Protein backbone atom coordinates (compact mmCIF):
# COMPACT_ATOMS: atom_id res chain seq x y z
CA UNK A 1 0.00 0.00 0.00
CA UNK A 2 1.21 3.47 -0.93
CA UNK A 3 -0.27 6.66 0.51
CA UNK A 4 1.13 10.19 0.47
CA UNK A 5 -0.66 13.28 1.72
CA UNK A 6 0.17 16.98 1.34
CA UNK A 7 -1.60 19.76 3.21
CA UNK A 8 -1.86 21.99 0.13
CA UNK A 9 -2.58 20.88 -3.42
CA UNK A 10 -0.87 24.02 -4.70
CA UNK A 11 2.57 22.46 -4.07
CA UNK A 12 1.79 19.46 -6.27
CA UNK A 13 0.34 21.76 -8.93
CA UNK A 14 3.54 23.82 -8.98
CA UNK A 15 5.72 20.69 -9.18
CA UNK A 16 3.71 19.42 -12.13
CA UNK A 17 3.85 22.82 -13.87
CA UNK A 18 7.63 22.67 -13.48
CA UNK A 19 7.99 19.39 -15.40
CA UNK A 20 4.99 18.86 -17.68
CA UNK A 21 6.34 21.00 -20.54
CA UNK A 22 9.52 18.90 -20.63
CA UNK A 23 8.01 15.48 -19.98
CA UNK A 24 4.86 13.91 -21.41
CA UNK A 25 5.07 10.98 -19.05
CA UNK A 26 7.30 9.88 -16.20
CA UNK A 27 7.73 7.22 -13.55
CA UNK A 28 7.36 8.17 -9.90
CA UNK A 29 9.53 5.77 -7.88
CA UNK A 30 8.14 5.48 -4.36
CA UNK A 31 9.99 4.01 -1.40
CA UNK A 32 9.91 4.51 2.36
CA UNK A 33 12.37 7.41 1.94
CA UNK A 34 10.07 9.34 -0.41
CA UNK A 35 9.29 9.85 -4.09
CA UNK A 36 11.88 10.13 -6.87
CA UNK A 37 11.45 10.97 -10.51
CA UNK A 38 14.20 10.97 -13.09
CA UNK A 39 13.63 11.29 -16.81
CA UNK A 40 15.08 12.69 -20.00
CA UNK A 41 12.93 15.36 -21.61
CA UNK A 42 10.90 14.59 -24.73
CA UNK A 43 13.75 15.56 -27.07
CA UNK A 44 16.44 13.79 -24.99
CA UNK A 45 18.46 16.95 -24.45
CA UNK A 46 17.91 17.68 -20.76
CA UNK A 47 17.34 15.57 -17.67
CA UNK A 48 14.79 16.23 -14.94
CA UNK A 49 15.38 14.92 -11.42
CA UNK A 50 12.79 15.36 -8.66
CA UNK A 51 13.19 14.31 -5.02
CA UNK A 52 10.38 14.54 -2.47
CA UNK A 53 11.35 13.32 1.01
CA UNK A 54 8.87 11.23 2.95
CA UNK A 55 9.29 13.42 6.05
CA UNK A 56 8.06 16.45 4.08
CA UNK A 57 4.59 14.94 3.62
CA UNK A 58 1.80 15.30 6.19
CA UNK A 59 1.37 11.54 5.93
CA UNK A 60 3.52 9.05 4.05
CA UNK A 61 3.26 5.29 3.83
CA UNK A 62 5.03 3.00 1.39
CA UNK A 63 5.02 -0.66 2.39
CA UNK A 64 7.08 -1.76 -0.58
CA UNK A 65 8.89 -0.03 -3.41
CA UNK A 66 6.48 1.02 -6.12
CA UNK A 67 7.01 2.52 -9.58
CA UNK A 68 4.06 4.45 -10.96
CA UNK A 69 4.19 5.46 -14.61
CA UNK A 70 1.97 8.48 -15.18
CA UNK A 71 0.83 10.62 -18.07
CA UNK A 72 1.63 14.10 -16.76
CA UNK A 73 -0.96 15.79 -18.96
CA UNK A 74 -3.67 13.61 -17.43
CA UNK A 75 -2.35 14.29 -13.94
CA UNK A 76 -2.36 18.04 -14.61
CA UNK A 77 -6.04 17.84 -15.65
CA UNK A 78 -6.90 16.12 -12.37
CA UNK A 79 -4.93 18.65 -10.30
CA UNK A 80 -6.79 21.51 -12.01
CA UNK A 81 -9.90 20.22 -10.24
CA UNK A 82 -8.38 20.97 -6.82
CA UNK A 83 -8.48 24.23 -4.93
CA UNK A 84 -5.02 25.38 -3.88
CA UNK A 85 -5.82 25.01 -0.17
CA UNK A 86 -7.24 21.48 -0.52
CA UNK A 87 -5.45 18.55 1.07
CA UNK A 88 -4.28 16.13 -1.60
CA UNK A 89 -3.73 12.42 -1.07
CA UNK A 90 -2.28 9.93 -3.56
CA UNK A 91 -3.04 6.25 -2.94
CA UNK A 92 -2.17 3.04 -4.75
CA UNK A 93 -2.30 -0.62 -3.84
CA UNK A 94 0.77 -2.78 -4.35
CA UNK A 95 0.87 -3.99 -7.99
CA UNK A 96 -2.08 -1.73 -8.83
CA UNK A 97 -2.65 -0.43 -12.35
CA UNK A 98 -4.35 2.75 -11.13
CA UNK A 99 -3.60 5.54 -8.66
CA UNK A 100 -6.29 7.40 -6.73
CA UNK A 101 -5.86 11.14 -6.19
CA UNK A 102 -8.15 12.57 -3.52
CA UNK A 103 -8.83 16.22 -2.68
CA UNK A 104 -10.33 17.28 0.63
CA UNK A 105 -11.42 20.85 1.35
CA UNK A 106 -9.95 22.56 4.39
CA UNK A 107 -13.25 22.32 6.28
CA UNK A 108 -13.60 18.67 5.15
CA UNK A 109 -17.05 19.37 3.73
CA UNK A 110 -16.06 18.44 0.20
CA UNK A 111 -14.12 15.34 -0.82
CA UNK A 112 -13.44 14.45 -4.45
CA UNK A 113 -11.44 11.53 -5.75
CA UNK A 114 -10.10 10.71 -9.18
CA UNK A 115 -8.70 7.44 -10.42
CA UNK A 116 -6.00 7.53 -13.06
CA UNK A 117 -4.63 4.63 -15.06
CA UNK A 118 -0.95 3.95 -14.59
CA UNK A 119 1.40 3.26 -17.51
CA UNK A 120 4.18 0.77 -17.98
CA UNK A 121 7.13 2.93 -18.93
CA UNK A 122 10.55 1.60 -19.82
CA UNK A 123 12.81 4.13 -18.18
CA UNK A 124 16.45 3.60 -17.56
CA UNK A 125 18.02 5.20 -14.53
CA UNK A 126 20.96 7.29 -15.58
CA UNK A 127 23.80 7.50 -13.14
CA UNK A 128 24.44 11.15 -12.34
CA UNK A 129 28.11 11.42 -11.38
CA UNK A 130 29.19 13.53 -8.45
CA UNK A 131 30.98 16.59 -9.81
CA UNK A 132 33.19 19.19 -8.19
CA UNK A 133 31.84 22.26 -9.93
CA UNK A 134 34.08 25.15 -10.98
CA UNK A 135 31.36 27.65 -10.24
CA UNK A 136 28.17 27.64 -8.16
CA UNK A 137 25.85 30.66 -8.35
CA UNK A 138 22.89 31.20 -6.04
CA UNK A 139 20.54 33.97 -7.09
CA UNK A 140 16.88 35.03 -6.86
CA UNK A 141 14.77 32.64 -8.94
CA UNK A 142 12.62 35.48 -10.33
CA UNK A 143 15.74 37.30 -11.52
CA UNK A 144 17.04 34.21 -13.33
CA UNK A 145 13.64 33.69 -14.99
CA UNK A 146 13.59 37.28 -16.18
CA UNK A 147 17.15 37.11 -17.56
CA UNK A 148 16.36 33.92 -19.50
CA UNK A 149 13.16 35.42 -20.87
CA UNK A 150 14.83 38.69 -21.89
CA UNK A 151 17.85 37.09 -23.55
CA UNK A 152 15.70 34.64 -25.53
CA UNK A 153 14.54 37.66 -27.58
CA UNK A 154 18.09 38.14 -28.88
CA UNK A 155 19.31 34.62 -29.54
CA UNK A 156 18.55 30.92 -29.27
CA UNK A 157 21.67 30.58 -27.11
CA UNK A 158 22.80 32.23 -23.92
CA UNK A 159 26.42 32.39 -22.76
CA UNK A 160 26.94 32.18 -19.01
CA UNK A 161 30.32 33.45 -17.85
CA UNK A 162 31.30 33.13 -14.22
CA UNK A 163 34.33 34.91 -12.76
CA UNK A 164 35.24 36.20 -9.33
CA UNK A 165 33.81 39.59 -10.34
CA UNK A 166 30.38 38.10 -10.88
CA UNK A 167 28.25 36.20 -13.36
CA UNK A 168 27.45 37.48 -16.85
CA UNK A 169 24.63 36.33 -19.12
CA UNK A 170 25.04 37.22 -22.81
CA UNK A 171 23.12 36.69 -26.02
CA UNK A 172 23.90 37.84 -29.52
CA UNK A 173 21.75 37.73 -32.64
CA UNK A 174 20.25 39.70 -35.53
CA UNK A 175 18.72 42.28 -33.20
CA UNK A 176 22.01 42.96 -31.49
CA UNK A 177 23.81 41.93 -28.33
CA UNK A 178 22.59 41.78 -24.75
CA UNK A 179 24.77 41.49 -21.65
CA UNK A 180 23.47 41.22 -18.10
CA UNK A 181 26.01 41.21 -15.28
CA UNK A 182 25.30 40.34 -11.67
CA UNK A 183 27.87 41.05 -9.00
CA UNK A 184 27.94 39.15 -5.75
CA UNK A 185 25.77 41.02 -3.26
CA UNK A 186 27.15 42.45 -0.06
CA UNK A 187 24.90 42.31 2.96
CA UNK A 188 21.22 41.99 2.10
CA UNK A 189 18.25 42.22 4.44
CA UNK A 190 16.52 39.29 2.77
CA UNK A 191 18.49 36.13 2.09
CA UNK A 192 16.33 35.30 -0.94
CA UNK A 193 17.53 38.49 -2.68
CA UNK A 194 21.21 37.59 -2.40
CA UNK A 195 23.54 36.68 -5.26
CA UNK A 196 26.23 34.35 -3.96
CA UNK A 197 29.06 33.02 -6.12
CA UNK A 198 31.41 30.23 -5.12
CA UNK A 199 34.15 29.96 -7.73
CA UNK A 200 37.08 27.58 -7.96
CA UNK A 201 37.99 28.66 -11.49
CA UNK A 202 36.35 30.84 -14.16
CA UNK A 203 33.99 29.09 -16.56
CA UNK A 204 32.19 30.19 -19.73
CA UNK A 205 29.54 27.95 -21.27
CA UNK A 206 26.78 28.26 -23.87
CA UNK A 207 23.28 26.86 -23.41
CA UNK A 208 20.02 26.68 -25.38
CA UNK A 209 17.63 29.42 -24.23
CA UNK A 210 14.49 27.40 -24.70
CA UNK A 211 15.55 24.79 -22.17
CA UNK A 212 16.60 27.39 -19.61
CA UNK A 213 13.20 29.03 -20.05
CA UNK A 214 11.50 25.66 -19.57
CA UNK A 215 13.45 25.16 -16.33
CA UNK A 216 12.26 28.51 -14.99
CA UNK A 217 8.71 27.10 -14.84
CA UNK A 218 9.88 25.90 -11.40
CA UNK A 219 10.25 29.50 -10.17
CA UNK A 220 7.02 29.45 -8.09
CA UNK A 221 8.51 26.62 -6.00
CA UNK A 222 11.49 28.54 -4.67
CA UNK A 223 12.74 32.06 -3.98
CA UNK A 224 16.30 31.08 -4.97
CA UNK A 225 17.85 29.06 -7.77
CA UNK A 226 21.29 27.47 -7.80
CA UNK A 227 23.34 27.15 -11.00
CA UNK A 228 26.28 24.74 -10.89
CA UNK A 229 28.75 24.80 -13.79
CA UNK A 230 31.92 23.10 -14.89
CA UNK A 231 33.58 22.80 -18.31
CA UNK A 232 32.31 19.86 -20.42
CA UNK A 233 29.78 18.88 -17.75
CA UNK A 234 26.02 19.52 -17.83
CA UNK A 235 24.76 22.64 -16.08
CA UNK A 236 22.67 21.85 -12.99
CA UNK A 237 19.77 24.20 -12.27
CA UNK A 238 18.34 23.45 -8.83
CA UNK A 239 15.21 24.73 -7.11
CA UNK A 240 14.66 23.77 -3.48
CA UNK A 241 11.10 22.82 -2.52
CA UNK A 242 10.81 24.08 1.06
CA UNK A 243 10.66 21.30 3.67
CA UNK A 244 9.95 18.72 0.96
CA UNK A 245 12.86 18.22 -1.44
CA UNK A 246 14.20 19.69 -4.67
CA UNK A 247 13.94 19.66 -8.43
CA UNK A 248 17.08 19.61 -10.57
CA UNK A 249 17.47 20.13 -14.28
CA UNK A 250 20.60 19.02 -16.16
CA UNK A 251 21.51 20.57 -19.50
CA UNK A 252 24.62 19.83 -21.55
CA UNK A 253 26.45 22.91 -22.87
CA UNK A 254 26.56 23.66 -26.57
CA UNK A 255 29.91 22.68 -28.07
CA UNK A 256 30.40 25.73 -30.29
CA UNK A 257 29.38 29.29 -29.50
CA UNK A 258 28.16 29.92 -33.03
CA UNK A 259 25.98 26.84 -33.10
CA UNK A 260 22.25 27.56 -33.06
UniProtKB/Swiss-Prot annotation:
Source domain of life: Eukaryota
Subcellular localization, as worded in the UniProt entry: Nucleus; Chromosome; Cytoplasm
Single GO cellular component term: nuclear replication fork
Pfam assignment, any one: PCNA_C
UniProt cross-references to InterPro entries, sorted A to Z: DNA_clamp_sf, Pr_cel_nuc_antig, Pr_cel_nuc_antig_C, Pr_cel_nuc_antig_CS, Pr_cel_nuc_antig_N
GO MF assignments: chromatin binding; DNA binding; DNA polymerase processivity factor activity
GO biological process: DNA damage response; DNA replication; DNA-templated DNA replication; eggshell chorion gene amplification; leading strand elongation; mismatch repair; mitotic spindle organization; nucleotide-excision repair
Family statement: Belongs to the PCNA family.
Main location class: nucleus
Record carries keyword DNA-binding: yes
Name used for this protein in its record: Proliferating cell nuclear antigen
UniProt DNA-binding region: 61-80
Phenotype of the disrupted gene, per the record: Mutant flies show temperature-sensitive lethality, hypersensitivity to DNA-damaging agents such as ionizing radiation and methyl methanesulfonate, suppression of position-effect variegation and female sterility.
Tissues expressing the protein: Expressed at high levels in adult ovary.
Subunit record text: Homotrimer. Forms a complex with activator 1 heteropentamer in the presence of ATP. Interacts with E2f. Interacts with the catalytic subunits of two DNA polymerase complexes: PolD1 from the delta complex and PolE1/DNApol-epsilon255 from the epsilon complex.
Keywords: Chromosome, Cytoplasm, DNA replication, DNA-binding, Nucleus
The protein's role, per its UniProt record: Likely to be an auxiliary protein of DNA polymerase delta complex and is probably involved in the control of DNA replication and repair by increasing the polymerase's processibility.
